[in-house]
Each structure stands twice: as C-alpha cells, then as structure tokens.
C-alpha cells in the first residue's frame, strides 16, 4: 500500500466519508473526507443533504492531501527524512488541525526534529487538541510511542 493509500485509509476512519453535503460540529458545510466547502466551490451553495459524487470526493481529497503534504513540508523542514509512520501521524494531525494550529505545536515540532518520539507523544497528549479529539489523538499518540519503541529494539 502506498503512503497516500495508507493516509486516505486512516483519514477515512478519522474523518468519515460522506457522499453528501453536511454541517460539521461548527455548523460549516462539509463533504467527502472532512472537506470544508469553500466559497467558490459548487458545494458551498448546496443545501445540506445534496449528493456529492465519488469522483468529486476523490478530487477534493486529492487537493486537500496536496495542501496537507505541502503544509507538513513547510512546517517540518526535514519532513521527507522522517520515518513513514511519523509522516503519517503528522499528516493526520495537519489535516485535522490545519497549518496555523499545527504550527502552534512548537515543542512537538522541536521533538520531531531531534527524533524524540516520546517527547513528541507527550506534547500531543498535553494539548487542547487531544482533549477535543481523544479517540483520534489517542490512536496517534500510541502510534508515536510505538515509533520510539521500534527505535529501542
């Protein structure tokens, strides 16, 4: 399975997949795999419940993942050199948080730079984000800790 296939699979679990426009927990129009409908996109003017094709969901996801990957490279300059599992975790967080909020995880990012996976996991756990999305963040924290365990073996 390619990196993008792995990422899509985990984001489908964390975000869900909706083939219609719906209102997210903030009342914002969303569709597909956690795609926020933006002004200028056709879905922005559609009512909740309007169907969205599988092809359109794939197109929007492709654009969102491209932005997510570029944002990860922007915030973490050595992103491409990180273990794949850490890249997946960072992309999942970036997809969920967006670049401005992800960039606020300064100690997490510093720990990633020095490959201190335990500190990175601690910083993930010690955040408002973790309290907001405990199931998702809990899985990602466990995975980050496992990267550290793999290094010790």
PLM regions: where:
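Alpha-helical scaffolds flanking conserved acidic
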Residues: 4-8, 81-91, 119
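Long, amphipathic alpha-helical surface segments
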Residues: 1-20, 26, 35, 52, ...
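Substrate-binding/active-site groove segments that recognize
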Residues: 23-45
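Generic secondary-structure boundary/loop-capping signal
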Residues: 19, 28-33, 76-79, 92
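Surface-exposed patches in mature extracellular/periplasmic domains of secreted proteins
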Residues: 19-22, 74-86, 123
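Alpha-helical segment that forms one wall of the substrate-binding/catalytic cleft
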Residues: 44-76, 84-91, 95-102
